[in-house]
Structures are given as C-alpha cells and as structure tokens.
C-alpha cells in the first residue's frame, strides 16, 4: 500500500516555508491505518523487539503507540510535556534550536528492568526522540529502539539517536 498517498501536505504550516505532513488523512483511512499498524508490528517482530512497554511521545505518538502496544502484547506509557501528568514524574530538559523544553513520565510507570520501544508519528531533527531515550535511560530502562511513521531525511534526526533499530515507514 502506498502510505505516502494517504498523507496530506499542508504548505506554509505552521509557518511559511514549512510543509506539514498531516497524518489525519491516514488515520481516517481504515485500510491505511490497519496496514500502518500491521507493518509496524511486523517490522518490530522482524527486529526481534519484544518490549514490556511502548512509550508514545506527545501527542501523535499516542495514536500509533496504543494499537502497536496491543499488537505486541505490551503496555503503553505516555511521555508528556510539563504539567500534563497528574502524579509524581521523572523529567528531563533538552535543548531546542532556539531554547529548551522538557518531557515528563510518571514515576510509577516504568522501572529499571523494563524494556521499552519509543514511538512517534514523525522524526525530524531527532531532539525529542533523543531526549525521550535519555529520560528512559536515566530511569534505568533498556531502550530497544524507535518506530516512526514518517522520517524527514534531510533533517538528520536518525544520526542523533543511539545505535538501535529505527523503524520508519515513509521517507520525505
């Protein structure tokens, strides 16, 4: 199936010169969504990945992470922006091109012996994925790899990530 044909391009969003890759058109296509999750599942199995948890990055990582967790018989854990989780959290601050940001995960969500797979809809510069891996490694989790629907090749995000399996389905 040609997944790229199910992604809508929105020029000049969120600002001039940017082409936004809109996944909502993939999400509302039943066969495309099923194919996406089935393909992610198959690729994870091909790599021999057997995570205890899928860690979904806010917020579109949740959309693909939950069904992938179900398929892999794993739990699901959200990583969120500050102030979005109600209980005690672990956090990590990371640098952006112009400033910094931080991510949080519930303290009781994972433990040092857990194996995790990080999932998001898209990898661009890799900063958020790298920070998520850093947060999980700080806790003592074993990061097994990463899974993304879309990779923006020219932004070089893959090179910033640890030498682990990186699954992508669509390249731009």
Curated annotation (Swiss-Prot):
GO terms for molecular function: adenine binding; adenine phosphoribosyltransferase activity; AMP binding. Signal peptide: none annotated. InterPro entries: Ade_phspho_trans, PRibTrfase_dom, PRTase-like, UPRTase/APRTase. Pathway: Purine metabolism; AMP biosynthesis via salvage pathway; AMP from adenine: step 1/1. Its EC number is 2.4.2.7. Keywords: Cytoplasm, Glycosyltransferase, Purine salvage, Transferase. Its main location: cytoplasm. PROSITE patterns: PUR_PYR_PR_TRANSFER. The keyword Glycosyltransferase applies. It catalyses: AMP + diphosphate = 5-phospho-alpha-D-ribose 1-diphosphate + adenine. GO terms for biological process: adenine salvage; AMP salvage; purine ribonucleoside salvage. It is found in: Cytoplasm. One of its GO terms (cellular component) is cytoplasm. Gene3D superfamilies: 3.40.50.2020. It is an enzyme of class 2 (transferase). NCBIfam families: apt, PRK02304.1-3, PRK02304.1-5. Homodimer. Belongs to the purine/pyrimidine phosphoribosyltransferase family. Catalyzes a salvage reaction resulting in the formation of AMP, that is energically less costly than de novo synthesis. This is Adenine phosphoribosyltransferase. It comes from Microcystis aeruginosa (strain NIES-843 / IAM M-2473). The gene is apt.
């Amino acid at each position: 199936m040609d997944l790229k044909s199910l992604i809508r391009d929105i020029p000049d969003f969120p600002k001039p010169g940017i082409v936004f890759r809109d996944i909502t058109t993939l999400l509302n296509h039943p066969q495309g969504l099923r194919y996406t999750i089935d393909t992610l599942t198959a690729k994870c199995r091909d790599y021999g990945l057997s995570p205890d948890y899928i860690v979904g990055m806010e917020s579109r990582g949740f959309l693909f992470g939950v069904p992938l967790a179900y398929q892999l018989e794993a739990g699901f854990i959200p990583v969120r922006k500050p102030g979005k989780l109600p209980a005690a959290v672990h956090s990590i601050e990371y640098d952006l091109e112009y400033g910094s940001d931080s991510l949080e995960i519930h303290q009781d969500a994972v433990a040092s012996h857990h194996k995790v797979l990080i999932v998001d809809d898209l990898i661009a510069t890799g900063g958020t994925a790298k920070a998520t891996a850093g947060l999980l490694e700080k806790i003592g989790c074993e990061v097994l790899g990463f899974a993304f629907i879309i990779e923006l090749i020219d932004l070089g995000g893959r090179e910033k990530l640890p030498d682990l399996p990186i699954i992508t389905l669509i390249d731009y």
